Amino acid sequence: MGNEFQHRTVLLDEAVDALVTRPDGVYVDGTFGRGGHSRAVLARLGDAGRLIAFDKDPRAIETAESIEDARFEIVHDSFAAMKGALDARGVGRVSGVLLDLGVSSPQVDDPARGFSFRANGPLDMRMDPTRGESAAEWLARASVQELTEVIRDYGEERFAFQIAKAIVARRAESDRLGPLDSTGELAQIVGHVVKTREKGKDPATRTFQAIRIHVNQELADLQVVLEAALSLLEQGGRLVVISFHSLEDRIVKRFLQAHASAPAVDRRLPIRAADLPRPPLKLLGRMFPNDAEVAANPRARSAVMRIAERVAP
């Protein structure tokens, strides 16, 4: 591809600084995207270092395959497949795992991918357009209840039921109007239902987010990869996760806190704190983009990066 769809990597230096602790370590970039983080990690690694990256998007794979570096390998799969893929490569432990969640700018900015409500295109929304069910296919069969639950739970949209009913009503007109298969029409349907306006936010934002998360199983895959990362990290290894909305960040925060806290024990039991198993993770804090980065890249505004280190075997 040319330069028509540019992508600015969010928290680039901060993420790589937090991630790379050993130049000769094995690292995982769970979301290659357009390779900003991966290239920066490779620049920090020594000759014995290794980076294994994952992505579902065929265009990301094309970009990754242009990297001619013996220390680098790309896997065309979800980061949820990380544990099995590393096992197959004989990798038992890694020095760091980086996850940059959500959709990338080139995906959003390309109308043909169907992620954006700002430009009309096919209603697809799959990270990998060659696998699974598209958004249009799901919308053509989902019940009002299922639509409501997805839009409410994944979009935190208070008009979820009304939007679901409007989608099903439009579907009933398919014989006359044809299928609901364009982003522009879906955005129009949502816009007619959502009467209130959030400053600076299109009324379709929450619904499109919800459908994208559902189609790509993003939150389920996130739970899987967090568990995988914990099992793969060597002592001293780092987990770095960049989230872009509250649903993702909530899952990450709860997971990290749960594995950085000592187990609760009844005070009446004769057990010393020193005898309790040590929590596997230590929290190293969170970071946000600075004002200059947000000014240069407004999509960075909602980003939050959480960092944890494996401290117990």
Swiss-Prot record:
Subcellular location: Cytoplasm
InterPro entries: RsmH (IPR002903), SAM-dep_MeTrfase_MraW_recog (IPR023397), SAM-dependent_MTases_sf (IPR029063)
Primary localization: cytoplasm
GO molecular function list: rRNA (cytosine-N4-)-methyltransferase activity
Keywords: Cytoplasm, Methyltransferase, rRNA processing, S-adenosyl-L-methionine, Transferase
GO BP terms: rRNA base methylation
Function as written in the Swiss-Prot or TrEMBL entry: Specifically methylates the N4 position of cytidine in position 1402 (C1402) of 16S rRNA.
Protein name per UniProt: Ribosomal RNA small subunit methyltransferase H
Native source organism of the sequence: Burkholderia mallei (strain ATCC 23344)
